[in-house]
């Protein structure tokens, strides 16, 4: 079909499928980052609960991937420093820290849900385009066999 008849070209479909594939990959990477943030918040809350229980020693990860642990002793359990966002941190009591972390987790969870909805829409559109491209390919193969 030509553009003048209100249709789209095969090249347009292929370009759209390629764009959607890259977009889906980007959304999936962002989704993974959000899930990692939620897991980090859960770990932080668990550490606060350990401090609140009066435990004076704790094993902490030195790196992000958990290749190295260190035993930290002499923990004084009345205040912690919490990341508020951007480059801002605050020293707060343990209960306030948990409230801040819960609020941040809720925000990230909502963002993850919105992103998941967008990911589903993009994947659905991508699958529809791939189905159309497969139908075009099958029709072309049948035409070649008929020649």
From Swiss-Prot:
One of its GO terms (cellular component) is cytoplasm. GO terms for biological process: protein folding. It comes from the Archaea. Belongs to the prefoldin alpha subunit family. The gene is pfdA. Its main location: cytoplasm. Gene3D superfamilies: 1.10.287.370. PANTHER family: PREFOLDIN SUBUNIT 5 (PTHR12674:SF2). One of its GO terms (molecular function) is unfolded protein binding. Heterohexamer of two alpha and four beta subunits. Molecular chaperone capable of stabilizing a range of proteins. Seems to fulfill an ATP-independent, HSP70-like function in archaeal de novo protein folding. It is found in: Cytoplasm. Keywords: Chaperone, Cytoplasm. This is Prefoldin subunit alpha. Signal peptide: none annotated.
